Regions:
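Rieske [2Fe-2S] iron-sulfur domain-containing proteins
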Residues: 1-261
Length: 261
């Protein structure tokens, strides 16, 4: 079949999904040994473009599942729980898909009206197969860092610019471009206010491993950082509370005996 020959396809989404699964299953058993190097590279481009478009289709599907709370029919209380447990994606991939969908899908408001994507230029690039979910996650990350005081038109222009450069860059490259854009929009941090800090703040305490150790991740406000600095200055000075030294002074530095130190 010629590459430009039209193929009659059904309109029903479920039928299209079943058809795509059959195509992928057939492709998985295909032998590429007879293909030329040029054909191999062309096929890789086609498949990557298809995968990126699948990200867009998946986002549209998840938006409908979320709007209709269809995940409850599967016994889950939230979309995230359905993705992580029902589809067995795990928390990390479930979060990635939620972020992608929130940025490029057409969601419904409380009145049932379908809204335009939050990131319209990004959604268009995904529909073209030019960028994928990893690009969308980085664009979302950069857009969240734009101060609230920035004019909405400037913000929209920033999203369009990020989507444009994403068509030619890796996700890491988009992040670099995003940081340059942020430096241009708010070079000295003067536009960032308390609303932005509250919106961006986060603190995560990971679960304990087999050694009962836990990882910590966070993005601290100036106030919380100051509290940590006071605690570290008091309890973590050199020579204080050293578990390798039974004779090490215990407690706060202010309460330690100078003679012992």
């Amino acid at each position: 079949m010629a590459a430009n020959q039209a193929v009659a396809l059904p309109d029903d989404p479920a039928e299209l999904a079943a058809l795509s699964e059959a195509v992928i299953a057939k492709l998985a058993t295909a032998a590429f040994t007879a293909s030329t190097e040029g054909q191999l590279l062309e096929t890789a481009e086609i498949l990557e473009r298809a995968n990126r478009r699948f990200d867009g289709a998946t986002s549209a599907l998840l938006a409908e599942i979320s709007d209709r709370s269809a995940y409850r029919k599967a016994g889950f209380l939230s979309l995230h729980a359905y993705l992580a447990g029902g589809l067995r994606l795990g928390d990390g991939e479930a979060k990635r898909r939620r972020i992608t969908g929130a940025g490029i899908a057409r969601l419904a408001n409380l009145q049932g009206e379908t809204l335009a994507p939050v990131f319209p230029a990004t959604a268009e690039a995904v529909a073209d197969g030019a960028i994928g979910a990893d690009h969308v996650v980085v664009i979302d990350e950069m857009m969240r860092k734009i101060p609230s005081a920035v004019d909405p038109q400037v913000r929209a222009g920033a999203e369009a610019r990020l989507a444009e450069v994403a068509r030619d860059l890796t996700p890491a490259g988009v992040r670099t471009a995003g940081h340059r854009l942020l430096a241009h929009l708010d070079p000295d941090g003067a536009l960032t206010d308390e609303r932005d800090r509250k919106r961006l703040r986060q603190f995560g305490l990971g679960g304990q491993d087999q050694r009962l150790m836990s990882k910590v991740r966070g993005y601290l406000t100036p106030e919380l950082r100051a509290r940590f600095e006071v605690m570290f200055d008091s309890w973590a000075k050199p020579g204080m509370n050293n578990p390798a030294d039974p004779a090490s002074p215990r407690g706060a530095a202010e309460a330690a005996d100078p003679a012992t130190l």
